[in-house]
Curated annotation (Swiss-Prot):
GO terms for cellular component: cell surface; centrosome; cytoplasm; cytosol; membrane; microtubule cytoskeleton; plasma membrane; spindle. Keywords: Cytoplasm, Cytoskeleton, Glycoprotein, Hyaluronic acid, Phosphoprotein, Repeat. Coiled coil: none annotated. The modification Phosphothreonine is found at T703. Residues 365-546 are annotated as: Required for interaction with FAM83D. GO terms for biological process: hyaluronan catabolic process; receptor-mediated endocytosis. Residues 1-22, 40-81 are annotated as: Disordered. It holds the Pfam family HMMR_N. It comes from Homo sapiens. InterPro entries: HMMR_C, IHABP. Residues 635-645, 657-666 are annotated as: Hyaluronic acid-binding. It comes from the Eukaryota. This is Hyaluronan mediated motility receptor.
Length: 724
């Protein structure tokens, strides 16, 4: 079998949108195309025509009131959309407030970190001060030990040297004595002729001895003066001990500062706990707001569904309202009474809004006044700080360590000023947030007023529509009364329609009650929101007051600390001036002693030279005396030798006395030199301590040399040259 060829366009329908099913005839279409083509039956034709007629009748029979009701329902849906937008705006505002609170929390955390850094710096300063105190105490202990050792060693070395010198002199004298005894036996005769010469020389030596005795008296007077000066030095040492007592007082102050630091740490921990609690509370509030948003969305969906149902019911019941205008007149009177009630409620709400607006204005004025007061206080504090800084700059030029502390305090004050500026910015932010909240409340109130005005307008339009419909219905009623005899059969249907209208009226009453309840709920919500915002405002005011009190306390504490530091600087400057004056007095007093020591050394050398010349003369006299006495009798020789021995013993005793006096003088001079070195802070190297000392001697000075102390190194150099 062979099939016919299909055309190119298979199953090709006409272009364009097809009509609705059942609204067209198959026969009126174009020629059928495709392999399968058959003619449909005409079973759907009558139903289609009937449905079209019904739809046309429905469209024509709908009155203008029903169309207006539909427009009112669209307006209600628009109102619901507006309410949702307003709620979304509120949610955004709350989220912005949450962001601002998070920023505040971050700022507080940064402030806590700064406080911790300051505490760490204070602890470091404390440790450095304690280390410096420990090193100073060690140095004092070492100096006392070195002084005791030097005293003991100088006394031992002096005795040993004197013993050695005396032993050597005794040996020499013994040798000389033996030589003299040998020469005396041979030279007694020559000595008798030279006795007169020796007597003259003895008289001259006696005169010299008298001069030496006068010098000894002057030396004793100088010793008395030196004792008085040593007493003064002991008084200075007592003052140094008083300074050590002050160091102990400073240690006690440091302990008190440690306790204060512990208290500050506890306060910081409490602040952290309060911050954590605030964060938890805010998170809970955010969760509650999210839950409220979900509930509002659900309510929106319910309202939309209800509106749809109401639209359907209203479309079904509007045809029955035409014949039953009598009941609607009664309902109209009731609605007029309700309108009066609504007007009274609106007036009350307007009065409340005006009172709230006045309260907000008064609150804003109070905030502005407080802000001005804060600015004036800040200006005063800044002026005082400038004055204090000028005073500090004048007072702290002498001591560098105190300058560094003042700089650190100035930096802390700058940080506090920055904090105050930040707090002012926070105040401005809080005021801005408050104004935003008030604006939002005003917007909500305006939206509510607009919604109420729209409701009243809708109600008035509905009244006008009902009046026009009532007039139409009156005309229709007159025509119906004329046709009442003819329409007797339709009386039962009319009664059913009356019952339906009554049910519809009841539903309208329910709708009005629902609207009233919703308006009451919204009013309560507005009141709750206002109360919550007022509570937040009061909380912010309390927080600001607390922060102001804290800042005032901090400023007072810092002013007290500054005053204490100024007092300490004044005391230190006074002590420095005292020590400078004492040092200058000591230096002026020690200058003549140094000159006297130089003069004593010159006299000592002259005496030693004279002693050598006298010994040479004695030797010559002895030789000549021995030559003279060589030929005389033994008795005379013996007598002369006895006299010479007596004179020799006297001379030896005088020489020993003079040596003892010289040794005492040397000891006193060494003691004075040691005390001078202690006062001037100069150390001399002791050879007995070589390679045995614990700490190095030539260490670098920690503090630089001050003005006026350039002569402190001349005295020891001159002393060293004089001892050389």
């Amino acid at each position: 079998m062979s099939f016919p060829k299909a055309p190119l366009k298979r199953f090709n329908d006409p272009s364009g949108c097809a009509p609705s099913p059942g609204a067209y005839d198959v026969k009126t279409l174009e020629v059928l195309k495709g392999p399968v083509s058959f003619q449909k039956s005409q079973r759907f034709k009558q139903q289609k025509e009937s449905k079209q007629n019904l739809n046309v009748d429905k469209d024509t029979t709908l009155p203008a009131s029903a169309r207006k009701v539909k427009s009112s329902e669209s307006k209600e849906s628009q109102k619901n959309d507006k309410d949702l937008k307003i709620l979304e705006k509120e949610i955004r505002v709350l989220l912005q407030e949450r962001g601002a609170q998070d920023r505040r929390i971050q700022d507080l955390e940064t402030e806590l970190e700064k406080m911790e850094a300051r505490l760490n710096a204070a602890l470091r300063e404390k440790t450095s001060l304690s280390a410096n105190n420990a090193t100073l105490e060690k140095q004092l202990i070492e100096l006392t030990r070195t002084n005791e050792l030097l005293k003991s060693k100088f006394s031992e070395n002096g005795n040993q040297k004197n013993l050695r010198i005396l032993s050597l002199e005794l040996m020499k004298l013994r040798n000389k004595r033996e030589t003299k005894m040998r020469g005396m036996m041979a030279k007694q005769e020559g000595m008798e002729m030279k006795l007169q010469v020796t007597q003259r020389s003895l008289e001259e030596s006696q005169g010299k001895i008298a001069q030496l005795e006068g010098k000894l008296v002057s030396i004793e007077k100088e010793k008395i003066d030196e004792k008085s000066e040593t007493e003064k030095l002991l008084e200075y040492i007592e003052e140094i001990s008083c300074a050590s007592d002050q160091v102990e007082k400073y240690k006690l102050d440091i302990a008190q500062l440690e306790e204060n630091l512990k208290e500050k740490n506890d306060e910081i921990l409490s602040l952290k706990q309060s911050l954590e609690e605030n964060i938890v509370i805010l998170s809970k509030q955010v969760e509650d707001l999210n839950v409220k948003c979900q509930l509002l969305e659900k309510e929106k969906e319910d309202h939309v569904n209800r509106n749809r149902e109401h639209n359907e019911n209203l479309n079904a019941e509007m045809q029955n309202l035409k014949q039953k205008f009598i009941l609607e007149q009664q309902e109209r009177e009731k609605l007029q009474q309700k309108e009066l009630q609504i007007d009274s409620l609106l007036q009350q709400e307007k009065e409340l809004s005006s009172s709230l607006h006045q309260k907000l204005c008064s609150f804003q004025e109070e905030m502005v006044k407080e802000k001005n007061l804060f600015e004036e206080e800040l200006k005063q504090t800044l002026d005082e700080l400038d004055k204090l800084q000028q005073k500090e700059e004048q007072a702290e030029r002498l001591v560098k360590q105190l300058e560094e502390e003042a700089k650190s305090r100035a930096e802390e004050l700058k940080l506090l000023e920055e904090k105050l500026k930040g707090k002012e910015a926070e105040l401005e932010k809080s005021s801005a947030a408050h104004t935003q909240a008030t604006l939002l409340l005003q917007e909500k109130y305006d939206s509510m007023v607009q919604s109420l005005e729209d409701v009243t307008a809708q109600f008035e339009s509905y009244k006008a529509l009902t009046a026009s419909e009532i007039e139409d219905l009156k005309l229709e009623n007159s025509s119906l009364q004329e046709k009442a005899a003819k329409a007797g059969k339709n009386a039962e249907d009319v009664q059913h329609q009356i019952l339906a209208t009554e049910s519809s009226n009841q539903e309208y009453v329910r709708m009005l009650l629902d609207l009233q309840t919703k308006s009451a709920l919204k009013e309560t919500e507005i009141k709750e929101i206002t109360v919550s915002f007022l509570q937040k405002i009061t909380d912010l005011q309390n927080q600001l007051k607390q922060q102001e009190e804290d800042f005032r306390k901090q400023l007072e504490d810092e002013e007290g600390r500054k005053a204490e530091k100024e007092n300490t600087t004044a005391e230190l400057t006074e002590e420095i001036n005292k020590w400078r004056l004492l040092y200058e007095e000591l230096y002026n007093k020690t200058k003549p002693f140094q000159l006297q020591l130089d003069a004593f050394e010159v006299e000592k050398q002259a005496l030693l030279n004279e002693h050598g010349a006298a010994q040479e003369q004695l030797n010559k006299i002895r030789d000549s005396y021995a030559k003279l006495l060589g030929h005389q009798n033994l008795k005379q020789k013996i007598k002369h030798v006895v006299k010479l021995k007596d004179e020799n013993s006297q001379l030896k005793s005088e020489v020993s006395k003079l040596r003892c006096q010289l040794a005492k003088k040397k000891q006193s001079e060494t003691k004075l030199q040691e005390e001078l070195n202690k006062v001037l802070g100069i150390k001399h190297f002791d050879p007995s301590k070589a390679f045995h000392h614990e700490s190095k001697e030539n260490f670098a000075l920690k503090t630089p040399l001050k003005e006026g102390n350039t002569n402190c190194y001349r005295a020891p150099m001159e002393c060293q040259e004089s001892w050389k």
